[in-house]
């Protein structure tokens, strides 16, 4: 028999597993082929000699299990070798390993990527399989949880009632990643249509500087009045701010003075599509504000300072701390600039944009940009690549130039 080593001659016996693995000569005492070899005796381990294995290279991508041999496992190892298929038979393990080779992790490893590049966070990532089976039940629950916007009381935060309804009433709770990406795509489509409309269609520039007093709930006065580009882009800013806050991890977040922003200890890993859509929405908002402020500055230049306040329907008296503010012709323009700077600051803080990509200025002692969505090294590389790609295209809008142009025209309105 091939496995009976006692009947073999010393020069025909098989080497032990340890010597065969190290490709060394297996020395034993002459006439005692069944004893342990000298190398195993010197190392103080058990000398195990298995049956001869088939020659040749093993199949490609076959997972070789690691076998650890201990004292008292000789019977179990021999039983395993006896039940193994012969050299000419079919290997069942190789058939089982075929499904393992088709896993997503092996495919991503072969192309140099990781599965974490496509996920946002383990806390807010939702599996796709239960969504398909529970789509009808979730739809009915979402309808039951829908809140009438008219019942919402006015708050101190700057927001509008035209935001898309979500299943969660608390803005601090995270939105599911697939919902965030869908809502960002819808917002991007609305901003593209608004950018085209504000460039091609005429609109009331004088109404942009019109001061009014509102005693109603927040957002109700805008719903009744005629749609204005400034109101539309302000609603888009608030919606983008809420969506960006939904991408932050609430477990390790600390509440900041902003209504929506949270500061996590470690920035979450986002999908590339989410980062690019959010960046494109921000660039479109900056472009729309750049067109609005350019028209406003041209209007201020064409109108004398003495007649700037003549378009007000009724004289308004503003008070700070009970003291009236003296009337100023350029007060409305300065208030508008500061309001938009504060609004963009909230978005830029959530996105974590560097200083040269921001419209608003931040304090030097803060590090909000490092904790935003573009705070990681991977996101910073993606941001630089996207901005450089936008600069190299012919006939398209220059992203850096629109940020600089908006900063310049806002500074001109302040100094007017």
UniProtKB/Swiss-Prot annotation:
- Judging by the UniProt lineage, the source's domain of life is Eukaryota
Residue ranges with Low complexity bias: 74-86
Any phenotype upon disruption?
A: Impairs the production of fusaric acid.
User: Coiled coil: which residue ranges?
Assistant: none
Localization, per the record, is: Nucleus
Q: Which GO terms describe its biological process?
A: nitrogen catabolite activation of transcription from RNA polymerase II promoter
| Start and end residues of each stretch annotated as Disordered | 50-92
> GO: which molecular function terms?
DNA-binding transcription factor activity, RNA polymerase II-specific; zinc ion binding
Q: Used how in biotechnology? A: Fusaric acid is phytotoxic to plants such as cotton and banana. It has been shown to induce programmed cell death in plants. In addition to a mild toxicity to animals, fusaric acid exhibits acanthamoebicidal, antioomycete, and antimycobacterial activities.
Gene3D superfamilies membership: Zn(2)-C6 fungal-type DNA-binding domain
Example of a GO cellular component annotation carried by this entry: nucleus
* Keyword line: Nucleus
Any matching Pfam family: Zn_clus
**DNA-binding region located at which positions?**
16-47
Q: Where is the composition biased (Polar residues)?
A: 61-73
Q: What does this protein do?
A: Transcription factor that regulates the expression of the gene cluster that mediates the biosynthesis of fusaric acid, a mycotoxin with low to moderate toxicity to animals and humans, but with high phytotoxic properties.
Record-given protein name = Fusaric acid cluster transcription factor FUB10
């Amino acid at each position: 028999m091939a496995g009976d080593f006692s009947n073999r001659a010393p020069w025909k016996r098989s080497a032990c597993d340890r010597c065969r693995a190290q490709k060394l000569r297996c020395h034993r005492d002459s006439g005692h082929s069944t004893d342990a070899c000298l190398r195993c005796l010197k190392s103080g381990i058990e000398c195990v000699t298995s049956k001869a294995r088939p020659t040749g290279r093993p199949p490609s991508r076959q997972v070789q299990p690691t076998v650890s041999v201990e004292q008292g496992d000789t019977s179990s190892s021999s039983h395993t070798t006896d039940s193994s298929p012969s050299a000419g038979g079919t290997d069942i393990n190789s058939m089982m390993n075929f499904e393992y080779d088709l896993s997503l992790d092996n495919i991503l490893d072969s192309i140099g990527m990781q599965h974490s590049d496509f996920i946002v966070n383990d806390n807010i990532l939702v599996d796709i399989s239960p969504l398909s089976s529970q789509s009808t039940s979730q739809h009915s629950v979402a309808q039951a949880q829908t809140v009438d916007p008219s019942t919402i009381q006015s708050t101190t935060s700057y927001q509008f009632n035209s935001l898309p309804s979500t299943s969660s009433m608390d803005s601090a709770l995270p939105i599911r990643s697939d919902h965030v990406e869908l809502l960002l795509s819808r917002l991007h489509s609305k901003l593209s249509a608004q950018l085209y409309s504000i460039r091609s269609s005429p609109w009331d520039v004088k109404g942009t500087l019109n001061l009014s007093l509102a005693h109603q709930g927040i957002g109700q006065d805008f719903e009744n009045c005629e749609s204005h580009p400034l109101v539309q882009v302000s609603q888009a800013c608030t919606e983008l701010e809420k969506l960006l806050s939904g991408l932050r991890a609430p477990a390790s977040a600390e509440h900041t003075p902003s209504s929506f922003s949270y500061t996590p200890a470690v920035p979450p890993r986002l999908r590339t599509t989410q980062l690019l859509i959010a960046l494109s929405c921000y660039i479109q908002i900056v472009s729309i504000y750049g067109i609005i402020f350019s028209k406003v500055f041209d209007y201020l230049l064409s109108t004398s300072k003495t007649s700037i306040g003549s378009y007000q329907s009724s004289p308004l008296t503003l008070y700070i701390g009970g003291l009236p503010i003296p009337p100023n012709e350029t007060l409305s323009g300065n208030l508008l600039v500061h309001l938009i700077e504060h609004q963009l600051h909230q978005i830029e803080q959530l996105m974590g944009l560097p200083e040269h990509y921001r419209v608003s200025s931040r304090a030097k002692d803060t590090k909000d940009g490092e904790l935003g969505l573009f705070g990681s090294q991977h996101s910073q590389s993606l941001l630089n690549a996207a901005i450089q790609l936008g600069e190299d295209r012919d006939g398209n809008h220059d992203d850096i130039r629109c940020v600089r142009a908006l900063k310049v025209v806002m500074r001109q309105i302040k100094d007017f």
